[in-house]
Amino acid sequence: LDGLPMNTTYNNGMEWEMVPVEKIARIEVVRGAGSSLYGGRAVGAVVNIITKDNPEKKGASVNAVVSYGSNNTWKKALYADARVNKKLSFGVGYENRKSDGFKGYYYTGSASKDTGTIKPDKELPQLSSGKYILGGRGEKVWENENISANIKYDFDEDRSLKYTFIHTESEYRYQNPWTTIYKDGKPVFSGSVDVGNGQIVKPSIGTYLGYDGRKESDLHTLSYNDNKNKT
């Protein structure tokens, strides 16, 4: 982001939640050996997301965005930027993104020879591999909050010093576990299920259970730019 690494030190993954989407000016892709200028994790290529700069002329601007999508997906954002004088400018921003999610995971099981104790109301759906679809964890509900601020001091037309702070909070959980197995109209999540031909599947209730997650991240950057002495 603006030439600075966004990968985590834990697993080298990308902190996408920290990217202030409404502030993106352009995206650059650096391929080949030149990407090594960005550090040891940048071998092969670099994707550099460039954000919009603060206004050049004295004054202030405010940008608000509200959008809605499928699965009750919302995005709300508010950004304000201002230039105090010829040398000093700053910006603040807030983004909230959340969704009720969708059923993106399903649990399958292979049949084995045995006598089942549960005779389902109807045949279970089956994949071409022969495995049976037994259900899933349900929808993955998530919410991200992103707060950002920056202050920039221009020494002259070529040299500037900029401090940027980004704070992100992310939460997710699974809800409404579902099953394809019903007995007398009631959902079945465990047991020995008769699928016919002397075969059974044995779903386990633990497989249907999702998990909760929460993550907080802070990013502080101090960058000095000297256009006059670039090489």
Give short role names for the model-derived ranges.
Residues 14, 38, 65-68, 134-139, ...:
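Outer-membrane beta-barrel domain signature
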Residues 14-20, 41-65, 74-79:
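N-terminal periplasmic accessory domains that precede
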Residues 26, 31, 46, 61-63, ...:
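Membrane-embedded beta-strand positions in outer-membrane beta-barrel channels/transporters
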Residues 29-30, 60-63, 128-135, 190-191, ...:
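Extracytoplasmic loops and strand-loop junctions of Gram-negative outer membrane beta-barrel proteins
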Residues 57-63, 89, 160, 231:
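Outer-membrane beta-barrel architecture
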Residues 68, 72-99, 107-175, 214-219, ...:
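Transmembrane beta-barrel wall of Gram-negative outer-membrane proteins
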Residues 107-116, 168, 177-198:
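Flexible, surface-exposed loop regions and adjacent strand-edge segments
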